[in-house]
Regions:
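Short, basic (Lys/Arg/His-rich) helix/loop patches that form interaction surfaces
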Residues: 29, 43-52, 57-61, 68-115
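Basic, alpha-helical nucleic-acid-contacting "clamp/cap" segments
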Residues: 9-56, 73, 77, 129, ...
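Short, charged phosphate-coordinating catalytic segments
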Residues: 1-12, 103-104
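Conserved strand-loop elements at the edges of beta-sheets that form or border functional pockets
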Residues: 33, 86, 124
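Catalytic-site neighborhood detector that most strongly recognizes the C-terminal catalytic loop/helix
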Residues: 19-23, 109-136
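Generic alpha-helical segment signature
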Residues: 63-64, 130
Length: 137
């Protein structure tokens, strides 16, 4: 929710996570083709807003505001009992089911702590490869 304009690269289809609980969480996250238009529309709805994701009034989304105002009501409407973290778990599962390389999955979700030394030192993926992977789900 803390995506500032300078950390979002819509033309290249990714955003930079620059604040995380762990060093491994700092990464480039691909934006799937399916949702790119939503990111663009949200951004264009308030070009002067500092943050990509914002309230209708152009204010920064706090997690609790987002969860209570958007996520929870949507889950209730759909009859689904899930948290935002469940979405992360589902993403990992869908990527694995799609046959995506485990190292790419770890890069996307920031699990580099679970990487082997070889994966950390010798494997590098450009953002196009990460976008291609996320587009398979």
């Amino acid at each position: 929710l803390d995506l500032k304009e300078e950390n979002v690269h819509l033309n290249e289809q990714y955003f930079d996570v620059i604040c995380s609980k762990t060093e491994n969480g700092i990464r480039k996250v691909p934006i799937a083709d399916k949702v790119l238009s939503y990111y663009k529309a949200w951004y264009e709805s308030c070009p002067e807003c500092e943050y990509l994701l914002h309230t209708e009034a152009g204010k920064h989304f706090e997690y609790r505001n987002y969860y209570d105002s958007y996520f929870k009501p949507l889950m209730e409407q759909l009859g689904i009992n899930r948290t935002p973290h469940c979405c992360r778990h589902t993403c990992i599962s869908l990527l694995a089911e799609a046959g995506i390389n485990q190292t790419i999955i770890k890069k996307i979700v920031g699990h580099s702590g679970a990487m082997t030394l070889t994966e950390k030192v010798y494997t590098h993926f450009d953002i196009k490869e990460l976008v291609d992977a996320i587009n398979k789900i």
